[in-house]
Every structure is written in structure tokens, then in C-alpha cells.
Amino acid sequence: MRFFLAITALVAAVTAAPSADVAAVNQMAAMTLAEADASCGNGASLYCCDKSKQGGDTGSPGQAGGVGLLGAIVGVNGLLQGLLGQCSKININAIGAAGVLNQECTARAACCQNTPSVAHHGLVNIALPCIPINSLVG
């Protein structure tokens, strides 16, 4: 009886799990550089982030850090830096705004703040300088 209940709960959990949003995936595939830059908004620029990227204009566009509880996770050498890796700015003026985003950035495109990100002293401090663009589209 318990085995049947466990299997039923597992099946219910799997069927209730959200599926990939096909419209958002298609929108990301056809997104131009101008649309991606507009998604970033004011005060942020479009970057291409890749863990294995070396050389060129790489580095953190802003300092992510804090002295609070999550400072070690989000800090300059923290866990979240590994999610995006090294980032280089996509110069839209040099490339042209009509270019397709996934042709110019085969890794992960992100919107990064133009000013350093600072988390002030407190219990939970999160200062994220970059946000993946696929989390802004949808």
C-alpha cells in the first residue's frame, strides 16, 4: 500500500512540474542585439558570459559582494560568480543592432550593471551585478 502511495505521489509530482516555456525559447533564438539591449534597460549593458573565456575585455563589470550571511556565496570569488563565469561586453555600436544575439554570444548573454554592485551591512546581502537575459525575457 505504501509503495503504491509513493508511486502515485511521484507521478503526481512529475506531471505537475512546469514545462519549458516554448514561446520564451523561440523569442530568445530570434532576439536581435537591439532587443536584448532594450531588455537590459537603463543603467545596464549587454555582456556575453562564458566560464572558459580567456583574454580580451573580460572581467566582472561590477563587484558583487557583501559582508552579510550570503557574502561568501555571492561575493567576488563566491558561488554565483561560477554561474556566469567571465563576461565580456558586447559592443552593439561596432557590431550593429540588427545582429542576432545567439550568433554574437554562443554562451550566456547577461545584463550587467554599469556601476559596481554593492550590498550594505545586514543579515542577508545580495548584490548581483549581472542577470542572465533569459530570466528577463518571458
From Swiss-Prot:
What molecular function terms (GO) are annotated for this protein? structural constituent of cell wall
Family note: Belongs to the fungal hydrophobin family.
The record's annotation in SMART domains points to: HYDRO
InterPro entries per record: Hydrophobin
Q: Which GO terms describe its cellular component?
A: extracellular region; fungal-type cell wall
Print the keywords alphabetically. Answer: Cell wall, Conidiation, Disulfide bond, Secreted, Signal, Sporulation
CDD domains, alphabetized:
hydrophobin_I (cd23507)
Residue runs in coiled coils: none
User: Can you say what this protein is called?
Assistant: Class I hydrophobin 3
> Where is this chain primarily localised?
secreted
Subcellular localization is given as: Secreted; Secreted, Cell wall
Origin species, per record, is Cordyceps militaris (Caterpillar fungus)
